[in-house]
UniProtKB/Swiss-Prot annotation:
It holds the Pfam family AIRS. SUPFAM superfamilies: PurM C-terminal domain-like, PurM N-terminal domain-like. GO terms for cellular component: cytosol. Signal peptide: none annotated. This is Phosphoribosylformylglycinamidine cyclo-ligase. NCBIfam families: purM (TIGR00878). Belongs to the AIR synthase family. It is found in: Cytoplasm.
Length: 351
């Protein structure tokens, strides 16, 4: 088959001419391999670069059930682009998925990421993946694969999108599904590290209205750093707690805040009554509420308001759970109790 005729002065086109730099992709793989290597754990078969990533379920599980989760970082990325700050969003990506699967009692086993951009900036992408690897280390799971998609024209220069995928395992007999939660149980709240990765469309609107100096000091760090603080990963302290006492239910406080996430683990007929005075509203949320004129109800529906994970235990176990989690470095408060639902009310009420 003869190639099509072209104009005498025309030169042959390459993939790079079309906007895809294969060499940059190869350079990125070389840069991130050491980060991924630090996350290796028992069960990983092979390294990065194969068509599929292999993982052997640990033999300690007699009846393993796999638990999967996927998520992104949302419009927090827009703030990362504006600040040219890319070192925290990788941990956000991991946290969003591993905290979700943890809620059902699962130990995170492995993680995969998807990084999409219009033009690949190797240093930026490597910084993001380094954060992903750090998140995997914090949660004890292996970064065993991923995809970097350079797609000219799909994203503006300097912007990218992220997606993450986590898989964990839990013994079938130890799945946490909220079925044992009963009246009188206690709701514990574990402190968040900040806004985490939800509500940033409202955050950005507040910033647009208030026009603050993001480099200004805000309680010992810049306002930018406070806004971009990575999502806290609760895996190790909560897995340890599950070995010591009965955790009846957990809720990762993400989009929808406390009032929409806690009901996801409650049986019909039960309500979690939360006391908003039981824990301090962190200064960053006070700042957002003040500068945005955000009502209390909207704050509780959009933001975590200082509580990143809710844990439900029996009243008899509450003090022991608090002591154990505090010793593990968590800030914990008794934020509410479980009671029978009253006619016409929601499954989580804040009083």
């Amino acid at each position: 088959m003869n190639p099509p005729k072209s104009a005498p002065d025309a030169q042959g086109l390459s993939y790079r001419d079309a906007g895809v730099d294969i060499d940059a992709g190869d350079a990125l793989i070389d840069k991130i391999k050491p980060f991924a290597k630090k996350t290796l754990r028992d069960g990983v078969l092979g390294g990065i670069g194969g068509f599929g990533a292999l993982f052997e379920v640990p033999k300690k599980y007699k009846e393993p059930v796999l638990v999967s989760g996927t998520d992104g970082v949302g419009t927090k990325l827009k703030l990362a682009f504006h600040l040219n700050k890319h070192d925290t969003v990788g941990q956000d990506l991991v946290a969003m998925s591993v905290n979700d699967i943890l809620v059902q009692g699962a130990e995170p086993l492995f993680f995969l990421d998807y990084f999409a951009c219009g033009k690949l900036d190797v240093d930026t992408a490597a910084t993001v993946v380094k954060g992903i690897a750090q998140g995997c280390e914090l949660s004890g799971c292996a970064l065993i694969g991923g995809e970097t998609a350079e797609m000219p024209g799909m994203y503006p220069d300097g912007e990218y999108d992220l997606a993450g995928f986590a898989v964990g395992a839990v013994e079938k007999s130890k799945i946490i599904d909220g079925s044992t939660i009963a009246e009188g149980d206690v709701v514990l709240g574990l402190a968040s590290s900040g806004i985490h990765s939800n509500g940033f469309s409202l955050v950005r609107k507040i910033i647009e209205r208030a026009n603050p100096d993001l480099s200004a000091d805000f309680h010992g760090r810049s306002l930018a750093d406070a806004l971009m603080a990575p999502t806290r990963i609760y895996v190790k302290p909560l897995l340890a707690l599950m070995q010591k006492l009965s955790v009846k239910g957990m809720a990762h406080i993400t989009g929808g805040g406390l009032v929409e996430n806690i009901p996801r683990v409650l049986r019909d007929g039960l309500t979690a009554e939360l006391d908003q005075n039981a824990w301090p509203l962190p200064p960053l949320f006070k700042w957002l509420q003040e500068h945005g004129g955000v009502a209390d109800a909207e704050m509780h529906r959009v933001f975590n308001c200082g509580i990143g994970m809710a844990v439900i235990v029996s009243a008899a176990d509450a003090d022991a759970a608090i002591a154990d989690l505090t010793a593990a470095g968590e800030q914990v408060w008794k934020i509410g109790t479980v009671r029978a639902t009253r006619e016409g009310e929601a499954q989580t009420v804040v009083v």
